[in-house]
Each structure stands twice: as C-alpha cells, then as structure tokens.
Amino acid sequence: KHAVTCRIIDWRRVEHSSEAAGRYFTVRHNDMEKDTAFQMSASNIRYGQGTTSELGMDLDDMQLRRTLVVMDPALISLPVGERVLESLKANAVDFDLFSEVSVEPTDSSFQRAAEVAIEGDYDSFVAVGGGSTIDTAKAANLYSTYPADFFDYVNAPIGKGKPIPGPLKPLIAIPTTAGTGSETTGVAIFDYVEKHAKTGIAHRYLKPLLGIIDPDNTLTLPPAVAAATGLDVLSHALESYTAIPFTDRPRPDRPIERPAYQGTNPISDIWAIRALEMVRDYLPRAVADTSDDEARGQMLLAAAIAGIGFGNAGVHLPHGMSYPVAGRVKDFHPAGYDVDHALVPHGISVILNTPAVVRFTAPADPGRHLRAAQALGAETEGVPGEDAGEILADQVIHFMKTLEMPNGLAAVGYQQEDVPALVEGTLPQHRVTKLSPIEAGPEELTRLFTDALTIW
C-alpha cells in the first residue's frame, strides 16, 4: 500500500444561476459544501405490446431458476396474470406466487413479503401490478438479501436511513397502471400505520433490473384509476422539473452517499418535460376512451419517462404533503377502487396539493414554472414572471376538472381543524420536502393546506 498526499490548490464549485443559459454552469470559488455532480441511474426498459410473454426467456437467459412472483391478487385470473405464469412455465422457471399485496402498502405488509422471501431463498423477483405491488417486491428483495431491523433502511427521521450495503437480486417489474413509474425508480413507499404517516425506503440499489412496459397490461384499467394514476405522472414530472438544482444540495463525503433524489439536472429535465407533453396529449384521451390503444400505451410510457426523471431529480412538496392526506383518511371511498376501507389514492392525494404549491414555489424560478405550464398546453408567450404560479396552477386545475377530480381536500373529508395534523404529518418528510425550491416550515405548510381545502 502507498500513502498518497494531495493538496487542493483551487477547488471550483458550481452555483445555481437564475439565468437559463447558466443554470448549471456558473462557477465560483467558495461555498465548498455544495455538490458539483449528479448521477443518473435507471432501470433497463423494454416497451411494446406482447413483451410480457418474454419474461420467462429473460429469467432463463440469466440462468435464474427460482423466483418469487409478487402479483396484485386481482390480476391472477386476468390475461396479464395468465401471460406471466404461462411464460414462466414455458421456460421451466420454478416460482412461488405471493399475492398478499395492499392497495396502499403498510409496514406490516412489507414485512410479511420480506418474511416469505427470506423463507423461500429465491434468486430473483418478478412484480406484476401497480406501484404498490412493485414497491412490495422491492422491499422483499431488500430484506431477504440484506436482513436487518425493518426500520434500519427506512428514511430518516422515521427510520435510521442506513444505505443499502450492495446490489440486490434481479427484479423484473411489469407495471399494470400508468402512474407511479416504480419500474424505473429506487423508491418503495409504505404507510407506517402506528404513526398515521407515509414514508419509504430510497436507494438506487432498489431499482428493478428490467421494467417490461406492455400496453396490453392496462386494457382492464378502470377510467377513474387511469385518471388518478395519470395525474401522478403529471406530478412526478412537474415536481422533478421544479425542484432545487443539484448544485444546491450538500456534497456527500462519498459517492455512495449521494441520494437517489438529487435535484434537477440537465438530463432529468429532458425526461420531465417530455412526460408533461405526453400527459397533455394522451391522458384525457386514455381516460375518456379505455379502448384508445395509442393513448393507453403512451401514458404507460409517460409513467416510465417521468419515473426516470424524478427517480434521479426527486419530487418535493406536493408529494410530501400527500403522505398525511393519504395516511389520515377518514371515510373517502373513491370510484374505481375495489377496496373495503377508506382510501385517498396516491395520485389524488398529490394533485390536490399541487395548485397551491406551484403558486408558492414559482417565485424561485418563474421561467421554469412557465416552461412546465407550456408543456402542459398553456399559452405563455408574453406572460410576466410574476404570473407564472397562477398560470401553472390554472393548467393543473384544467386537467383536474377534465378528469373529474375532487375539488380540494375538503371534498375528501378534511376540514380546517385537520390542518395542524396534516402539517405535523408533513414535517418528517425531509427526503422530499428538502427539495422544494422554497423552504416550507409549519407556517407555510399551514397556508398551503388551507389553500388546498377548496381549489376552485
């Protein structure tokens, strides 16, 4: 071993500039705590009708012989479930089927999946369903590969936020909703029931090895579910495009400590804007006519595209505020969801906060908010920067009305007296709220939730 001594003579840092042309490349010689790098990570993606039938061949080619299939129970007897199981059998892949998946996963449902995975000693995982199913498979993969106390890997401050020690076993994700983009991200979200809080695990090692995006798998998606999940796509893209720039984030001591959610960067911006444009063009069509194959397929692809963007840049206040909205639900029962308990679907819980948030964050970068509004179809030529928040909020509301979303938090059961509890539930969501371009403490969150009670 050799001892190496190095003296840094001139360490140049990158500073965020409000000028579009110099957003990422204005250089200065101080502010040493800021990062100068970002890292893009993404799952392999395969898109096309009929690609589900290739699953068994993929596992065979990787010489994987014992897999745990995590599947939404509603899909087992539907064509997508049948195609998955037939493909595995045709390629002599030994598998077990786990279907104890919650519509909104909890700490206990994650732990149950992990127990099954540990007992089965699997060499691979397959997830078939929406984001809840894929996230459950991620958790099963993690805890069976690196067993630990459940909260060791859970995001701080609810958990210890320990980094995942190394790569996981191969996970192939087959999404059946056009929403979460979980097939591309290193995030697994769950409800911590005891605290009425939503939190998760975030690390790039959680990303699936492959996402198989097959438009045939959304044929049976109810219109109301397509609307809610589609607005989640909108939120992912919008928040990742309006988050802090990566140069405003503290520099980690080691590269492995660089978070999955790093802030906006020149590459994630491309994915975010394209996803917003696809939502503009295809979401209303996909909801209005479930037989519109082009619109359904393009929304499924948009979910993955947005996932690649926000899976590296991150989301911020609308998602952070959504977690207590979903976790503290009282008696709201949404159309299209076959559940026997109260539920505010994730996409709805996010979009209800979005108009208030974009009005709040627009002063941080009016041009960026106007560009997002333009991608969603707004006319922005000649619009002054001070109107950026209102223009973007109006465009989001346009989609909410078109897709018949509830008119604010009051429409899903919350009142002014609930706001303090919603604020309390948002404050621990540091992983995402710290990416807001304007800091939101208790006072700001109180105003935002109050504004979100009734939207129009």
Task: Please report, for each region that a protein language model flagged, where it lies by residue.
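N-terminal small/polar loop signature for handling phosphorylated ligands or for N-terminal nucleophile
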Residues: I76-F150, P284-R296
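C-terminal charged capping/lid subdomain of soluble metabolic enzymes
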Residues: R28-N30, H369-W456
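An N-terminal, well-structured beta->alpha segment
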Residues: C6, W11, E19, R23-F98
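A glycine- and small-aliphatic-rich helix-loop capping segment at beta-alpha/alpha-beta transitions
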Residues: E86-A90, A114-G120, A139-A156, G186-H196, ...
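A glycine/threonine-rich phosphate-anchoring loop and its flanking beta-alpha core
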Residues: Y146-A260, A364, R371, A375
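Active-site segments that bind and position negatively charged phosphate/pyrophosphate groups
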Residues: T247-E390
